[in-house]
Regions:
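Alpha-helical bundle regulatory/interaction domains
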Residues: 1-33, 79-225, 229-235, 240, ...
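Extended, Lys/Arg-enriched charged tracts that mediate electrostatic binding to polyanionic substrates
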Residues: 75-76
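N-terminal low-complexity or simple alpha-helical regulatory segments
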Residues: 1-66, 70-72
Length: 247
């Protein structure tokens, strides 16, 4: 049944815990009073989320939910990183199905479909394969193509806030869902693939290993050289990997 919810937060841990179908952690890196808003919209098969928070931060998200996920920026601004992939205001990102990524994006929209639906719809609408990629991919559609899902996503978020009764109406939800799916698939089909990010993906792998090394020693203080040594990586390289992965 279609539904929606809009929640506001002043605690980053509560915000991370509320993100759907993920184990998320957020570390705020800037000074100030943290505030965030999370909008969740479920139509029939399509699920949507809108994320907005006010302070610089680094996040880690691990998702295993059998859905094909795409995301894009909801507001203009400088290029940022999600899982080693540069996210630009006019780009759209296809995520791998079992993603585990470091995130430095604060104003973000996401949509997902069951994997089998994404595959069949991609073939039917655009004649292309949309099975989730092995590694996250960033695509740049034409500005006019990208503007449509951004506009529809923003409108859905506004309805969730101001007129949630429209979203729960089955026919209205179906019409909105079809428009969003078509706009999303058109962007994915025509988008220009971003440059090879193999070096960034390697840096993200180093950060995952570093994170595991820290988690294996939760009750003792660790100095940076110790986990670097345990994962077989020089301290300088770990630092470079952190900067390229987290920004």
């Amino acid at each position: 049944m279609p539904s929606s919810a809009v929640r506001r937060f002043t605690d980053s841990d509560d915000y991370a815990a509320a993100i759907r179908a993920t184990r998320a952690e957020i570390t705020v890196t800037g000074r100030g009073h943290f505030t965030a808003k999370l909008t969740r919209i479920d139509l029939h098969r399509l699920r949507m989320q809108r994320f907005s928070d006010n302070l610089p931060r680094v996040g880690h998200s691990a998702v295993m939910n059998g859905r094909a996920i795409i995301s894009f920026r909801t507001h203009p601004g400088p290029s940022l990183l999600w899982g080693g992939v540069e996210t630009k205001p006019a780009s759209i990102t296809r995520h791998n199905e079992h993603l585990s990524e470091f995130i430095r994006v604060r104003l973000l929209g996401a949509m997902s479909l069951p994997v089998e639906d994404m595959v069949s719809i991609g073939a039917a609408i655009a004649g292309c394969g949309l099975t989730p990629p092995k590694d996250a991919l960033t695509l740049t559609p034409s500005p006019s193509a990208m503007a449509k899902p951004q506009r529809l996503h923003a409108a859905a978020g506004q309805l969730a806030e101001d007129a949630p009764e429209i979203i729960i109406h089955p026919e209205a939800a179906w019409s909105l869902e079809q428009a969003l799916i078509e706009a999303m698939v058109r962007c994915l089909a025509e988008g220009e693939l971003g440059e090879d990010r193999s070096a960034l993906r390697y840096h993200v792998l180093i950060m995952h290993r570093f994170r595991r090394a820290v988690e294996e020693n939760p009750d003792q203080p660790l100095y940076i050289p110790e986990p670097c040594k345990s994962i077989g990586c020089r301290t300088g390289r770990c630092g470079h990997a952190a900067r390229s992965s987290w920004g």
